[in-house]
């Protein structure tokens, strides 16, 4: 039956062509055909079995026509170069609701007094009529997918920038002015990317991101594409990427800057406390470096010493040479741990070591010199001088505060009766009779004149002169009779009571 079936199948194969069984028999007998070609005899030629397979003719790679040029252009191909990169840090990405108050992307050579812009140059443009340039934003890292943030400003629409250049003398240059970066919210990321892809804005044909990938919203790159057209041909220049541009408001990518330091010098042994005011930093991602050309050291501080991301309290590291004899100037930097970015350096001076920081030796030397100078003094320790000091008495306030001013002589007061006479004591007899009848005034009028001789001169300082004593005595006297004062009361040589 099997043979009859095979005969029947052979008959059908002649009528309908090769069957699946014939193909399997051909595959299984391939080894036998190689070892002994005469073993297998096919009723039909292999060409009849594979007659339905079409094989294209091989064309060498050198003979393939170019898809960029039609026809081929003589000379080197055009090239796009970035003559000035955009400034990487210092620009803040703005939302659409914030407007365009932040300015534009500056060039890397820009300074406070001289503003520059990103610039491109296209060379080998001989014979080209115009060049169409498209600028878009892509990821920082490969595969450089389209970024959801967009460009805004002059010649910008739908998040991209388009300009048309006319080359002159085989070269085309262009500076991008008033070009800003507009960021999107997280809920708008998907729609922004889909809009770019619909416009066929995908320089590296990377498509949309995968589910496990995450978009970095704090950093972008500018991607420049150029399409050159001429008489009867067109050429697309490969895309060129700029340096990364970081968002200023993000502490993970922002520019590092030291605003102020409370000390600009310190001991070479280190360990001194220094306060640094800076822009916002991440306390777990920041270092403070003291260094010069061939030496660097880290300052000592912890995360708790970073106050509100804008102040750092640290201790200075020791200088590598503790035996310096002259001040050594170094620089102080802020350094981010993740990307190694550093701030501009601030000067700091290490001072030589002080041999006697507490001044013990200088004090001892001064004391020794003073003792040597007092060897010939009869009272080297000042004991007798202390004994001669007099206690302050009640008359100390009589000493004039300004010794250069001399008091007037008492003779001038003797001729002016108003200075030592009572207002009611006048030659009027009625007034005198009135005073004598009063017991209080009668005792005063009959009392003996007051003299300073009744007071011991030990209560008077040596500085009180005769004029002052005469003035006091005249003030105490209540009579109009002038009482002379003895000279011996103020003479240290003789009279003592």
Swiss-Prot record:
One of its GO terms (cellular component) is cytoplasm. One of its GO terms (biological process) is rhythmic process. Coiled coil: none annotated. InterPro entries: Ig-like_fold, Ig_E-set, IPT_dom, IPT_NFkappaB, NFkB/Dor, p53-like_TF_DNA-bd_sf, RelB_RHD_N, RHD_CS. It is found in: Nucleus. GO terms for molecular function: DNA-binding transcription factor activity, RNA polymerase II-specific; RNA polymerase II cis-regulatory region sequence-specific DNA binding. Residues 359-383 are annotated as: Disordered. Pfam families: RHD_dimer (PF16179), RHD_DNA_bind (PF00554). CDD domains: IPT_NFkappaB, RHD-n_RelB. Transmembrane segments: none annotated. It comes from the Eukaryota. Residues 78-393 form the RHD domain. A motif (Nuclear localization signal) lies at residues 386-391. Keywords: Activator, Biological rhythms, Nucleus, Transcription, Transcription regulation. Does not bind DNA by itself; probably associates with a p50-NF-kappa-B homolog to act as an activator. Could be involved in hematopoiesis and spleen development. May play a role in the regulation of the circadian clock. This is Transcription factor RelB homolog. It comes from Xenopus laevis. The lineage of its organism: Eukaryota, Metazoa, Chordata, Craniata, Vertebrata.
């Amino acid at each position: 039956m099997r043979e009859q079936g095979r005969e029947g199948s052979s008959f059908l194969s002649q009528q309908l062509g090769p069957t699946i069984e014939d193909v399997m028999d051909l595959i299984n007998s391939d080894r036998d055909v190689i070892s002994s070609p005469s073993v297998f005899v096919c009723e039909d030629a292999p060409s009849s079995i594979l007659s339905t397979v079409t094989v294209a003719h091989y064309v060498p790679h050198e003979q393939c026509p170019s898809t960029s040029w039609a026809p081929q252009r003589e000379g080197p191909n055009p090239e796009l170069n970035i003559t000035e990169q955009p400034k990487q840090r210092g620009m803040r990405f703005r939302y659409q609701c914030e407007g365009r108050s932040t300015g534009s992307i500056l060039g890397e050579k820009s300074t406070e007094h001289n503003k520059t812009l990103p610039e491109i140059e296209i060379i080998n443009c001989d014979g080209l009529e115009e060049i169409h340039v498209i600028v878009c934003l892509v990821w920082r890292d490969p595969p450089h997918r389209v970024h959801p943030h967009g460009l805004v400003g002059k010649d910008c629409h739908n998040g991209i920038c388009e300009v048309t250049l006319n080359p002159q003398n085989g070269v085309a240059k262009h500076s991008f002015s008033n070009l800003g970066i507009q960021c999107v919210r997280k809920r708008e990321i998907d729609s922004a990317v889909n809009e770019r892809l619909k416009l066929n804005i995908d320089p590296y044909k990377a498509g949309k991101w995968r589910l496990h990938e995450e978009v970095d919203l704090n950093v972008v790159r500018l991607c420049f594409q150029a399409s050159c057209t001429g008489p009867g041909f067109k050429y697309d220049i490969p895309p060129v990427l700029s340096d990364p541009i970081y968002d200023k408001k993000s502490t993970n990518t922002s520019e590092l800057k030291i605003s102020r330091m409370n000390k600009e010098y310190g001991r070479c042994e280190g360990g001194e406390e220094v306060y640094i005011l800076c822009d916002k930093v991440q306390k777990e991602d920041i270092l403070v470096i003291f260094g010069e050309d061939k030496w660097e050291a880290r300052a000592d501080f912890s995360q708790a010493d970073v106050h509100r991301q804008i102040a750092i309290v640290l201790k200075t590291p020791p200088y590598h040479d503790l035996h310096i004899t002259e001040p050594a100037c170094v620089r102080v930097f802020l350094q981010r741990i993740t990307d190694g970015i550093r701030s501009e350096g601030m000067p700091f001076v290490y001072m030589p070591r002080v041999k006697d920081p507490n001044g013990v030796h200088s004090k001892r030397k001064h004391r020794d010199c003073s003792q040597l100078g007092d060897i010939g003094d009869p009272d080297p320790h000042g004991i007798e001088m202390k004994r001669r000091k007099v206690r302050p008495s009640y008359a100390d306030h009589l000493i004039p505060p300004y010794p250069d001013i001399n008091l007037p002589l008492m003779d001038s007061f003797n001729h002016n009766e108003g200075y030592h006479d009572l207002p009611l004591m006048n030659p009027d007899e009625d007034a005198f009779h009135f005073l004598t009848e009063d017991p209080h005034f009668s005792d005063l009028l009959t009392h003996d004149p007051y003299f300073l001789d009744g007071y011991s001169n030990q209560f008077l300082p040596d500085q009180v002169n005769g004029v002052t004593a005469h003035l006091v005595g005249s003030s105490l006297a209540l009579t109009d009779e002038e009482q002379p004062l003895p000279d011996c009361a103020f003479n240290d040589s003789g009279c003592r009571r």
